[in-house]
């Protein structure tokens, strides 16, 4: 197998790995969006009910009353907490969802472009394989 053909097979492998990583990134983006939307829903729920289920860990929860539902405490770094109005946090989270949706579109576009390159490269490799087979068949001595 010549060097150019080897390079094309390696490129095909790299493209496939890129698509896999981009799909993993899409999955992570989807999880972040779902988490943000769930948080927004929970904060909206605080406007009508002060009762929440508080996670204790390992699948255990306790019913709790929120004393100050107008304020949300956010973790903004290691051991750094910030208190903000609930409506402000909801707006911030909605903006984050919008930004993630835009990022998701960019990742999808990159996946499509990479898949197009994969299709193009596979087509070239199939043509080369057919040409090699044809040459190989022509070189074989014919037996009668």
Swiss-Prot record:
Pfam families: Prefoldin (PF02996). It comes from the Archaea. Its main location: cytoplasm. GO terms for molecular function: unfolded protein binding. It is found in: Cytoplasm. GO terms for cellular component: cytoplasm; prefoldin complex. Keywords: Chaperone, Cytoplasm. SUPFAM superfamilies: Prefoldin (SSF46579). One of its GO terms (biological process) is protein folding. Molecular chaperone capable of stabilizing a range of proteins. Seems to fulfill an ATP-independent, HSP70-like function in archaeal de novo protein folding. Belongs to the prefoldin alpha subunit family. Heterohexamer of two alpha and four beta subunits. This is Prefoldin subunit alpha. The lineage of its organism: Archaea, Methanobacteriati, Methanobacteriota, Methanomada group, Methanococci. The gene is pfdA.
